[in-house]
């Protein structure tokens, strides 16, 4: 019995000891928490000059959410090698694994990058470059025998070659070229007119023979005419010109950055009023063969189309114009049928372009166009010539003032254009229309205009510097002038608010 009891005691002690050890071990054991897999992210993305021969500078990207975006001047070669920093084990475009600083990718379109962690977690990024056309189309003009262009009347034979720089179709053909413009022809940087031997579509514009090269010598930004045309397009003014910035080499000499645009003329692809329609220019230069002074306001009316051959052909055109004008001068105005003769919405939109740009040429008037079909209303447009606008003063500086009144109502006697255009402001319905169109423009288009100025400025920055090297107008780096123009437009917007509220 003793032996059995002693064995039982020994067994009990063994069990107790084991229990104590297990309890002690359990109390000291730490809880094991499974590790959370690390999400793969793209930390940095860039295109480095050192890995891309021909690149002028590194291209930096902004990473926001799943978007990776950069803004960069347009380049013909868009197959570029990016560099990146990521915590992922692998990064892929499609099924192709990417190596930082080594794998070339076509950035002419959005590329989808997938980063994958060692645990198989994935994240997708959409990488794109917003390309801005900094490499402008280049026009190479070679006159016959290198003949200089010295006349606004006599054309010189020439060849024209256009390098579209990958953005536009290239072109080679024959043309004639002469000078153009009124006061602008007297400046060192000359404007020109081209007449192709055969109609052609140039720089994406509808096929025609006649084209214009605007020099913009007075313009420190080289974009004021383009900005005005943008406003006209936003307001849907009929037949507003397109503007394409270009570089020009004439007879093997680079002559600067120009605006390439359409010649204002009657044609199906220009001012489409038909063969029996009319195009008028109101201009105090008064230098066309067929012209007249209107009876009511002494407007200098010149006939641009149709092409007349005898003085008697002018009489019915003059009579019809005077009849329209008489309705404006009528003491019963505006309670008469004047709206049946003139498109008042076109007048209102036309005024707003000139108000916002502070183009006071309406007062003379100068370079002021009207058109009509044979049976239609007199309609304002196309808009033209904004060299002397945007706060321009006679010392040839822009942006000095933003609060100049649109009309010269304080002059004695009143200029012809002032009398004609301010007459519309005596019509309450017209003023209400003008105010509504302005409100609509401010809310729907003004911000886009400011962005257009920024984008256009970027697109010409290299050409602007090259132009400055020749003509020393404005500044070599036009970013300051771009910002000045944006600020001026914003201030001018506030002034137009006050002006219209005073009507």
Give the label of every model feature segment.
Residues 193-195, 199-201, 215-217, 237-241, ...:
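Internal "kinase-insert"/substrate-recognition segments embedded within catalytic cores
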Residues 27-137, 141:
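Beta-rich interaction/scaffold domains
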